[in-house]
């Protein structure tokens, strides 16, 4: 006698594994900076169908530029282009309209709306560690990495 719950779980895991991962900037930076969840990003990067939309490269570049300078930003982009990922350089009309609706209906940044729209239109699992994406729970499959915790250092 088969346990139907077990079969359902196994088939949903297999279904999740067949869907591509789409990495948000927060997930990619976790991998680059070896933060909590970097191992999960590394596993996703080993899959042949992992996706990186252009806003992730844009954010990675400008954040790195601000924090570590242009040389490091250039180095990171060069390394990202060597990864076994599909970089999504173009945005079609359906992705644009999906992003616009997400931005209109939810409290998320424009970049996050575009990144989520790419995931929705590509039937991908959005891997992130950005609590802003919590607003989109139920709209697309997501794998949240451990969020950063900020310690209040104020003296009372």
Q: What is the role of each PLM region?
A:
Residues 63-66, 85:
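Helix-loop "lid/cap" segments that line or gate small-molecule binding pockets
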Residues 1-18, 116, 120-156:
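Acidic, PIN/NYN-like endoribonuclease modules and their adjacent C-terminal/linker elements
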Residues 46-48, 82-83, 122, 139:
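Structured helix-beta-strand junction loops
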Residues 67-71, 106, 143-147:
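Short, hinge-like loop/turn segments at secondary-structure boundaries
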């Amino acid at each position: 006698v088969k346990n139907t719950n077990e079969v359902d779980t196994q088939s949903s895991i297999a279904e999740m594994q067949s869907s591509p991962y789409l990495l948000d900037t927060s997930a990619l930076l976790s991998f680059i900076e070896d933060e909590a969840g970097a191992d999960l990003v590394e596993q996703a990067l080993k899959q042949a169908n992992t996706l990186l939309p252009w806003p992730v490269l844009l954010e990675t570049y400008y954040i790195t530029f601000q924090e570590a300078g242009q040389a490091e930003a250039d180095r990171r982009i060069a390394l990202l282009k060597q990864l076994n990922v599909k970089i999504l350089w173009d945005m079609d009309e359906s992705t644009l309209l999906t992003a616009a609706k997400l931005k209109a209906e939810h409290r998320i940044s424009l970049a996050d709306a575009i990144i989520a729209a790419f995931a929705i239109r590509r039937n991908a699992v959005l891997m992130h560690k950005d609590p802003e994406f919590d607003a989109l729970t139920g709209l697309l499959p997501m794998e949240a990495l451990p969020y950063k915790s900020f310690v209040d250092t104020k003296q009372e």
